[in-house]
């Protein structure tokens, strides 16, 4: 795990979320010393912000698609 001040934009939402979950587990269980925990917390904030950015981008893309779509679009539930 690198602890840079910024995240590369090419890290996927899923990768960032997975790493964030690992950080939370480590901090919650007290597996890290104070300095490492603070660095992990800082990394966690970066990951959280990255995930929020990715979610916002996805939401805006969906809204744009919805606005461009014909108003007769019908959403149907499908079974998996």
Curated annotation (Swiss-Prot):
One of its GO terms (molecular function) is exodeoxyribonuclease VII activity. Coiled coil: none annotated. Keywords: Cytoplasm, Exonuclease, Hydrolase, Nuclease. One of its GO terms (cellular component) is cytosol. It catalyses: Exonucleolytic cleavage in either 5'- to 3'- or 3'- to 5'-direction to yield nucleoside 5'-phosphates. The keyword Hydrolase applies. Its EC number is 3.1.11.6. It is an enzyme of class 3 (hydrolase). Its main location: cytoplasm. It is found in: Cytoplasm. Gene3D superfamilies: Exonuclease VII, small subunit (1.10.287.1040). GO terms for biological process: DNA catabolic process. NCBIfam families: PRK00977.1-4, xseB. Belongs to the XseB family. Bidirectionally degrades single-stranded DNA into large acid-insoluble oligonucleotides, which are then degraded further into small acid-soluble oligonucleotides. Heterooligomer composed of large and small subunits. HAMAP family: Exonuc_7_S. This is Exodeoxyribonuclease 7 small subunit. The gene is xseB.
